[in-house]
A protein has these predicted regions:
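Juxtamembrane helix-break-helix junctions at the cytosolic face
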Residues: 67-82
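Membrane-helix boundary connector in multi-pass membrane proteins
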Residues: 78, 85, 92-114
């Protein structure tokens, strides 16, 4: 008996590909939200913490790229994994940003958003552990 879960594909066939595509659309939508105009100068915002790492428009590009990689990954496994890792890295930076904003008083309830992002990040790691949809699997 083993102490760990067996490594096997979580998503198979078109059903799995549809689930991955839905996740990708969410990631792309978040990227599009950040690609818009910046917040007015002097407006207190969590984005001030995140903007110290990279400008908001760049975060938009990162999220859109991750989402497109996940979409492409429904057919090419390596891209699926790369997209999820890129998304997980971006999400981790935003979690840290919200925690820093909470500690510094910029966003006293920022920890709530950080905690809300956490389950998505946990899902990404679970998907990475269990594996991408198998290549050539057309059964649904």
């Amino acid at each position: 008996m083993t102490d760990t879960l067996p490594r096997r594909p979580l998503l198979t066939g078109w059903t799995g590909r549809a689930a991955v595509a839905a996740l990708a659309l969410f990631i792309i939508a978040r990227g599009l939200a950040y690609a818009g105009p910046a917040a007015p100068a002097g407006a207190p915002s969590i984005l001030g913490v995140i903007d110290s790492v990279a400008p908001t428009w760049l975060w938009g590009i990162v999220y859109i790229t991750a989402g497109l990689l996940v979409v492409a990954g429904t057919w090419w496994q390596r891209l699926w994994t790369t997209g999820l890792i890129l998304w997980a890295i971006a999400q981790s930076v935003w979690i840290v940003g919200y925690v820093v904003a909470t500690v510094t008083g910029l966003a006293p309830r920022g920890w709530v958003t950080a905690a809300a992002i956490g389950p998505g990040l946990a899902l990404a790691f679970l998907l990475l552990y269990l594996g991408p949809p198998p290549e050539g699997d057309e059964d649904g």
